[in-house]
Amino acid sequence: MQKITPFLWYNGHVEEAVALYTSVFPNSKVLNSSPMSATVEIEGQQLIIFNGGAHYALTPAASLYVNCDTQAEVDRLWAQLVEGGAESRCGWLVDRFGLSWQIIPTILPKLLQDPDRAKAKRAMDAMLTMGKIDIAALESAARG
């Protein structure tokens, strides 16, 4: 079986991005690094980060999706990754290097896929008002 590894084209700052990502995720390591590129492993997922220049830009059309078990984890990751970047909607943010992340509590897909469609709609409506996802507010909205 072939291995699929995301290849991310950055406009400089590869070393700074690698330093941020490996500091934010405790289960991460740098596999190799040069001024042009680095390969990192974050929570078992390898990423190649390439210093390709301004020819191409990262876009929210591709993002890294992070499952979070607790609000504390959502809060910590959100704060560290959004610093110098930008908040977006529905759990999305863009870090200071232009990479989009989805910081999503594990309860969110469960609520959105609830067989009680009214409950799922209430959760969806609540999520659509949020930047960073608030688990307690989602659960409260889902309950009605």
Pin down the residues of each PLM region.
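Vicinal oxygen chelate
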Residues: 4-11, 37-41, 56-80, 85-90
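Conserved, surface-exposed functional patches that form binding/active-site neighborhoods
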Residues: 76-82, 87-92, 96-112
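N-terminal beta-strand motif that seeds the catalytic metal site of vicinal oxygen chelate
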Residues: 1-19, 24-32, 63-64, 107-144
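Conserved Rossmann-like nucleotide-cofactor binding loop
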Residues: 45, 99, 133
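Conserved short beta-strand elements that form part of the metal-binding/catalytic scaffold
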Residues: 28-59, 102-105
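Terminal peptide-recognition signature
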Residues: 6, 21, 40, 81, ...
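Short, electropositive, low-hydrophobicity segments enriched in small/polar residues
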Residues: 16, 48, 95
